[in-house]
Structures are given as C-alpha cells and as structure tokens.
Amino acid sequence: MNLRDLLSTQSVPNIEFSGISEMSRDVQAGDLFLAVGDSVGQKAHIIEAKRRGAICVLTDKSIPFGSDFSGVPVISMGDLATRRGMLASRFYSNPSGDLECVGITGTNGKTSIAYWIADLSSRIGVKTGYSGTLGWGTLGKLQPASLTTPNAVDIQKRLFHLLREGCSRTAIEVSSHSLDQGRVSDVHFDIGVFSNLTRDHLDYHKSMKAYAECKAKLFKDFDLKKAVVCVDDPFGKSIADYLGNRVLTYGLKGDVSWVATPSPYGYTVSWNTPWGDFENEFPFFCDFSISNLGAVIGVILSAGGSVKQLARELNYLKQIPGRMETISDKNQSCPCVIVDFAHTPEAVRLVLMSIRARVSGRLICVIGCGGDRDKGKREEMGKIVSELSDFVWLTSDNPRSEDPMKIIRQVASGITTGNYSVSLDRKDAIREAITSSQDQDIVMLLGKGDESTQEVNGVFLPFSDRDIAKEVVGGLI
C-alpha cells in the first residue's frame, strides 16, 4: 500500500509499504511502524524498528531528533494514538465490516462465552473465529496471545486473517483496558455481550465507577444491532435500561428474556427462550457456567441460528482449557482436581460456593494473587477462600516485580481460620495439596487457568498448573 493512500494526502513521501505494526519487536522488512509513547522510549523503539527493516515511521511526537532517522523517513502525526485502529483497518480493507463481530465484556465469563460462541456457531454451520485470553484463530488452531484484547493494529490484522480463513463471524473478548485505550474503536461490533461487573483492575481504573464506565463503552460508543446482557448484575440492569428494545436479557433469576434453571444436581438445564424451549444435560459444577451459556444461546439464536441445531450441539459442548477443567474425577482412585482461572474475589467466591455444595469430603484450595496488580483485593481473597475451603495452600501467582512472600502475607491477613499453609513454590503447593488429600476430596487450583508461564521479575518461566497436576495425579493412580 502507498503511504499517500493510507493517509489520504499527497503531502507525505511516495512510499510503498507491505505491512503495519505498532510494536517494534513485531516489525518485518518493508513495514510501516506506528510509534506512540514517550519520546525517550520512542527513540529506542524506532531504532529497533529500523533494524528490523521498517521502511517508514509515523510518530505522535514533534520529532525532536529530526524528520529523517538514519535513512528512514519519520513523519509526525499528533493524533496518531487515536487513529491507529483506523489506519490499520484501512490497510486491511476494513475486515470487521465483512464479519459479524461479537464483543464480550464483563469481569468474569468473557473467555467461556467467546469460546463457546466460536465452538457452537462453527458446529451449526457458521465458521467463527475467536480472539481472547486463550489466543486467537479458529478453535483447534489457536495462535498464542499475550493480552486478552490486542493492540489496535493487531486486532485488525487478526480479523483480516480470520476473514481469509473463511470465517463469517468472530467472538472477541473485550477488556476494560482495551475500551479505555481505544484499541477496538475501529472494530464494527454487531452484537455486544455483558456478563457481570465485580472488583478487578482497580490498580488501573482506581474506582469501580471508572471501571464500570469503561465496560459501558461497548454498549454506548458502538452502533450495535443487538446486545445480550445478564441482568443478575445491577450494572447489567442499567445497561439493559439504556439499550431499550435492542437488548436481550438473560440470567438465573428475575425478569429476563429467558431463564436457565439448573436442576438440584446442576446437570440438567431447561432453557426457556423466545425462539423455543429445550433441555440439555451438562457435566458442570457451577451455576455460573450455565449463566455463561445463556449469553451464548442468546447470541446464536438472535443472529438467526436454528433452535433445533443448537439444542443438539449443546450436548457436545467442548471443555474450555483452564476453565473448571477437571484433571481427575471421582471415578479415579485419587482426589478430584480442578483447574480454574478464577482470580477475582467474586469469581473465587462463586467457584468455591458451587464446589462446596457438591463435595462429599474436604475442599482444598491452592491460590495466590498476581503481583503489580490490584493490591486492595488480596485481603478479601484470603477471607473468601478461608471461609469456603477446608484447607488453603497460599502460593505464588505471577509475582512479577513484587516480593511473592509479601503478597502471600497480604492474602493471609484476610484468612479467618488457621487451616492454611504457605509454599512459595507453586509446584510444591500443588503437589502437597493433591498428595495430602483423600479420594473424596476436591482440590481447586485457582488463578492461572490455561496459562503456560509464571512471570517473575520480567522473566516468563515455563509453568502449567494443568501439567503439574497431571504429573502428580499420574503418580497416584
């Protein structure tokens, strides 16, 4: 593409470029590099981009170091930060305009809802891509991802490739950070989904009010054709009131468009929807999984999906990696071990309450809190986990630049019983939790889910709760 066509002006150099990037480490030969941020950092990134073969640079600064940087033209564009998505969308020929884009936001449940939308939509004949915490692409061929929602350029690139792969729909996890930073501003969302709002990311947003306002952007700043909103949550009710007749409401209680009513055992669910009623059986422990499915059903049926097809395919629902993922079950001669991503106070509470109602032995929990994140939730996490578990192993969970023992002490300050132990080494904590448990016990490994690394002082060390649990369980059976 020519730079003049991208910027719609003849006042810039006549340069052809073959790609676009806003991360210097991702630049390939012939790319246009978009440099945004502080001047000192930009200079280092531009040097790296040039070394990697960037053919031109756009910057949001006034270029104190000259308009030509070692042979690479550097062009100033003061509003570049807000135009990155638009430029990338133009370069990739507006891919979201040719896809049915479903954006999912909320504190908890984004991954489950997006993953199941991609899974079920594809199985009823609508090839659907996925972008979120687990990676991006089509299920079974996901590429790794470091952020729930990528930067403004990469989201357009992903949509372009999904379109080329034959997708006609995509399910996108939309984080509050991405809404606040404008990363998805140039994605044309057709359907928006809201799952819930509970405490998280207050290290970034500073208040629940600011956090809620960011989540609301998906429903107020985009021209949605339809929204699917959980009104079990008070904030969800306010979104539904704002949207009026464009909204479908769902939940496990209250006056909603349809209601999912779990059986006493949590496996049989009767769905009462505007498109018809049907019933399914699920191997779920948690009511919130059923609530998440309510969102999925609402999206697929409101987009024209067949009730009959969907009801059939729901019986073959895929297990989501790291979300209530069972490593061993009650039919094996070892404790039941479950891996889950729950890392907020409300998510931990919901998971443990659901499991508490179904365990015949003891409920054992392995948990930590991430470093350089919301410190205010740590004591609350300790209180919740101690009240709902029979025994707790406190350990590390991506301590980042913080002292892991300091984090553990902050979590421990909320523990109201003496039934806990500390192990800095998460692998040792998992091993001890499983080997010291009985066959009728349930061991919950919370916080990391499907993550494959442990972040310590800027280094990402290979680490998987799932792999460690399988290794320990394998030695018991």
Model-inferred region functions:
Residues 1-14, 26-32, 38-44, 82, ...:
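ATP-dependent carboxylate-amine ligase
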Residues 55-61, 228-231, 366-367, 391-398:
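Short internal beta-strands
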Residues 17, 30, 54, 71-72, ...:
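Short, well-ordered alpha-helix to beta-strand connector turns
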Residues 3-4, 63-69, 189-336, 412-416, ...:
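Acidic, Mg2+-coordinating active-site environments of NTP-dependent enzymes
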Residues 68-79, 143-146, 244-249:
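Active-site regions of enzymes building and remodeling cell-envelope glycoconjugates
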Residues 83-231, 235-246, 358:
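Phosphate-binding loop of NTP-binding sites
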Residues 60-62, 174, 196, 231, ...:
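Short secondary-structure boundary segments
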Residues 1-86, 90, 234, 259-261, ...:
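N-terminal leader/targeting and accessory segments in enzymes
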